[in-house]
Regions:
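Acyl-donor (CoA/ACP) binding surface of acyl/acetyltransferases
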Residues: 1-16, 48-166
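Helix-loop element at the rim of GNAT/NAT acetyltransferase active sites that forms part
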Residues: 14-31
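Active-site rim helix/loop that mediates acceptor-substrate recognition in acyltransferases
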Residues: 26-49, 53
């Protein structure tokens, strides 16, 4: 179940800091540096959500930036703190539906560090919703293992998303 992140600040921040320096989460962080998660008290520039299990525990976090001038979304962040892929996956799907159907944003652009286990799922999602792989930045980011990684860029337009739903 989705809820706004501001309602779960303490539990969410604890879950996020537990991921610091963990090999399993190195791709989410996208960097060698960690900082405390900033939960905004407004939704003008960013939408922030938590995924909750049936008992109301935070099992994941989903956010994206909003450009109000272009009505485009970017910087999609998705992290699952649990092994509950079913509920979390349904919540990610709800966020995608909301971006294009509820909020009627124009486009979603996001990226993934190549090698991240979620990359294949993103490729399938892009194909399912009529999006595209925009390109690849070579050696774009350095992770906690000291290695440089390529980054794949994606985009889905509202038009292609709605067309895929027919």
């Amino acid at each position: 179940m989705l809820d706004i992140a501001i309602n779960h600040i303490e539990e969410l921040k604890k879950a996020m800091t537990r991921t610091w320096f963990q090999e399993k989460y190195k791709f989410y962080n996208y960097d060698e540096y960690y900082r405390d998660l900033n939960i905004e008290d407004e939704t003008w520039n960013v939408h922030q959500f938590v995924s909750l299990d049936k008992d109301g525990n935070v099992i994941g976090y989903i956010d994206y930036s909003v450009n109000r001038q272009t009505y485009n979304c970017s910087n999609l962040g998705i992290i699952n703190f649990s092994d509950n892929k079913i509920i979390f996956g349904m919540d990610v799907g709800q966020v995608l539906r909301d971006i294009f159907e509820k909020f009627k944003f124009n486009k979603l652009a996001f990226s993934v560090v190549i090698g991240n286990p979620i990359e294949k799922s993103y490729d399938k999602m892009i194909s399912k919703y009529g999006g595209r792989i925009v390109g690849i930045y070579e050696k774009e980011t350095k992770l906690i293992d000291g290695e440089y990684y390529d980054v794949k860029l994606y985009e889905i337009t509202r038009e292609s998303y709605l067309e895929s739903k027919k």
